[in-house]
Amino acid sequence: MRFSGFVSGLGLGLLTAVSASPAAFPAPASIPDPIPAPVAPASPAIEERAAKVTVAVPSGTVVGSSSGKVDSFRGIPFADPPTGSLRLRPPKRLSKSLGTFDASGLSAAACPQMFISSGGQSVITEFLSDFLAVPFLTPITGQEDCLTITVQRPAGTKAGDKLPVLFWIFGGGFELGSSAMYDGTSLLSTAIDQSQPFIYVAVNYRVAGFGFMPGAEIKKDGSSNLGLLDQRMGLEWVADNIASFGGDPEKVTIWGESAGSISVLDQMVLYGGDASYKGKSLFRGAIMNSGTIVPAEPVDSDKAQSIYDTVVKTGGCSGASDTLECLRGLSYDKFLNAANSVPGLLSYNSLALSYLPRPDGKVLPKSPDVLVATGQYHAVPMITGCQEDEGTLFALFQPNVTTTSRLVEYLQNLYFTQATKQQVTALVNTYPTTLSTGSPYRTGLLNEVFPGFKRRAAILGDLVVSLTRRIFLQAAANSNPDVPSWSYLASYDYGTPILGTFHGSDLLQVFYGLLPNNAMRSVRTYYFNFVYNLDPNKGVTKYAKWPEWKESKKLMWFETANKNSIINDDFRQDSYEFIAANAGALVV
């Protein structure tokens, strides 16, 4: 099937169904224009938006902006620019005084990004980006000098208020994304309205080849998993500075989505569970939206080494006596092109990521699943969950994988090179070929855009998010039975053609609050309760009690945009049991 024809059909189908079905994305009563109409310079509103606010921090003064209910301080540097000789090295704490720093700009600069794939796949990506407005599908321009923190707080907050802190880690497959995509104003407005004010912090970290370059040379240099180290230094900055903004450094909850959610788990297992800084814990709670453990091969495995070797070859460094130093010496554009010469997230390889956190014996001593199973992690109360149709978005890029044999070959060659063909075949066979059992779920014979799509979407979603979530929860309950956890399944976008309640749709509902419905209000309330009390049920109590997962293996089901239920966490149990029993072979 030609991609252009497929995309045209996808676009027509989505537009038709969304306009006709209240189960998809019903339009709110009023949506503001994306580009507001010009306002006369003398307008008092302009003066209000331009108001400045200052905060004295240990290394200087930060100047932010104040608008309505929220003060914003965007793009505060927490590390020296990772450029030149600092490229492909662990972050170096800011070595100079901050002085008076203007953080009143509109956004913080992004780190260098993975290119959107060329060819037919880019047509799909461009359409999805335009139609769905999912941040990690939106191309952005980055720069190497990008290690910054953004802080937002309720207007009028002052040092000593000791508000709890919500530390956001963006997603994007460890290849895309930036803190600037995630303004916390909507979250803070809701929290303020229900008397649960907090401090919102968003960290920038290096992605793709700049932040997660693998290879034996990288391991030997001690320069693996740099993006995770950037996040960790951001947390340390919070410990040192957030009190000046009115936050409590002892009440930090880390929250992420997709790769950001996986990063939250990785922060829990970093250094074998050592999350201390200056004798205190860097965070006391964790929220993970769509991502937990990703069993991975070592940073110097054959699979990982092939990525490094490709980058070296593309960068013209193959003949160098020190290939890593050669990469550091390349111009920005040349290194960017070399780093992006390997397959990306939005390509045929899809979730078989080129760049991701990998065990290195130090930062990640072992694969995250092993660290959790053996209790080598910072065990804190946590919420974790998934969207019902996590895999649909990523199953769009393999229209030729139409048979069981091709699916087995695809998974074994790109995902699970350590598994035998028999193991991969047995895994695939736990997923029926009947259309009614595939994803998007509960849609009968509908949405099979090409042969094998719904089955593959089910498998990809389970392997990377949905069922690994259950494996993680069980392992954590076994290792630390006294630490509470809560889990959820979100289906509030049921009826969205082809995609269902897809990966990233929680950003639209929960983070941005696109629609002021029950899904948005209840999830935010549960989360804000957790930020305050480490329990989603304590605080604002107008919603049903969310049962702890370990007590009953039950999920909070955000069933529709206007209804929540409690269900058993037992869907696709045969597949779950197989994945759990073969976790050692199913590593990426």
Swiss-Prot record:
Pfam families per UniProt: COesterase
Domain of life: Eukaryota
Gene3D superfamilies documented for this protein: alpha/beta hydrolase
Keyword DNA-binding: no
Knocked-out gene: effects: Greatly reduces lipolytic activities at the early stage of incubation on minimal medium supplemented with either saturated or unsaturated lipid as the substrate. Also leads to growth deficiency on both liquid and solid minimal media supplemented with the saturated triglyceride tristearin as the sole carbon source. Does not affect pathogenicity.
Catalytic activity: a triacylglycerol + H2O = a diacylglycerol + a fatty acid + H(+)
Description of what induces expression: Expression is induced in planta during the fungal infection process. Expression is strongly induced in minimal medium supplemented with wheatgerm oil, but only weakly induced by olive oil and triolein. Within the promoter, a CCAAT box, a CreA binding site, and a fatty acid responsive element (FARE) are required for the basal expression of LIP1, glucose suppression and fatty acid induction, respectively. Expression is regulated by several transcription factors including MYT3, SAS, gzzc258 and gzzc066.
InterPro entries per UniProt: AB_hydrolase_fold, CarbesteraseB, Carboxylesterase_B_AS, Type-B_Carboxylest/Lipase
Signal peptide: 1-20
EC id: 3.1.1.3
Subcellular localization: Secreted
Single annotated GO MF: hydrolase activity
Similarity field: Belongs to the type-B carboxylesterase/lipase family.
Name assigned to this protein: Secreted triacylglycerol lipase LIP1
